[in-house]
Amino acid sequence: MAEASSVNVGSGCAEKGPEELSQEPARPGTNISRVKLFDTMVDTFLQKLVAAGSFQRFTDCYKRFYQLQPEMTQRIYDKFVTQLQTSIQEEISEIKAEGNLEAVLIALDAIVEESKDRKEQAWRPSGIPEKDLRSAMAPYLLQQRDALQRRVQRQEAENRQLADAVLAGRRQLEELQLQAQARQQAWQALHREQKELLAVLKEPE
């Protein structure tokens, strides 16, 4: 009896199931990808879900049927649990595919790794809201100011071009008016000369 008990204790400590190995905590300093961590969380959730809905609780809800058909009840329970796990896994897979979740988590891992190599300290709030607001808003406001200045400069350049065009039009109009006046004066002078010539021709001999 003593030998048998010692063998059982030794065998129980020597081997572990795959589920027990997967649930062991990670060693300090090891990096676990967020994709693997997410999958582990899903698996843990499914295990706890199945544990919460144990066969004992299932039979408590259907005692009379279980008493009449215990084997059928077991098969129904097994099929229900399998379909539930499959349905949840499919839903999660669809969510991961629609949101491109794996790529996002991998990118997040890359960002975290890159941040480890940075020597400068990350931004931290100072505890003074006004100061933090100024430090956060100042770059944006400066950018907006520069954009407005560039827009004003473009508008001023367009206005100068428009003013130059208006002045050129006015000068051209003045030149046309002067030309018209000169032609009118020339025509009037010619008309007077014609009248004088006709008057001379009509004088009696």
Swiss-Prot record:
Residue stretches in coiled coil: 140-190
Taxonomic superkingdom: Eukaryota
Main localisation: nucleus
GO biological process: cell division; chromosome segregation
Entry keyword ATP-binding: no
Subcellular location: Nucleus; Chromosome, Centromere, Kinetochore
InterPro entries given in the database record: PMF1/Nnf1 (IPR007128)
Region listing for Disordered, in residue ranges: 1-28
Annotated GO CC locations: MIS12/MIND type complex; nucleus
Pfam family, one: Nnf1
Keywords, alphabetical: Activator, Cell cycle, Cell division, Centromere, Chromosome, Chromosome partition, Coiled coil, Kinetochore, Mitosis, Nucleus, Transcription, Transcription regulation
Function: Part of the MIS12 complex which is required for normal chromosome alignment and segregation and kinetochore formation during mitosis. May act as a cotranscription partner of NFE2L2 involved in regulation of polyamine-induced transcription of SSAT.
PANTHER family registered for this protein in UniProt: POLYAMINE-MODULATED FACTOR 1
Assembly with partners or alone: Component of the MIS12 complex composed of MIS12, DSN1, NSL1 and PMF1. Interacts with COPS7A. Interacts via its coiled-coil domain with the leucine-zipper domain of NFE2L2. The interaction with NFE2L2 is required for the transcriptional regulation of SSAT.
Protein name: Polyamine-modulated factor 1
Species this chain originates from: Bos taurus
Lineage of producing organism: Eukaryota, Metazoa, Chordata, Craniata, Vertebrata
Gene name, Swiss-Prot/TrEMBL: PMF1
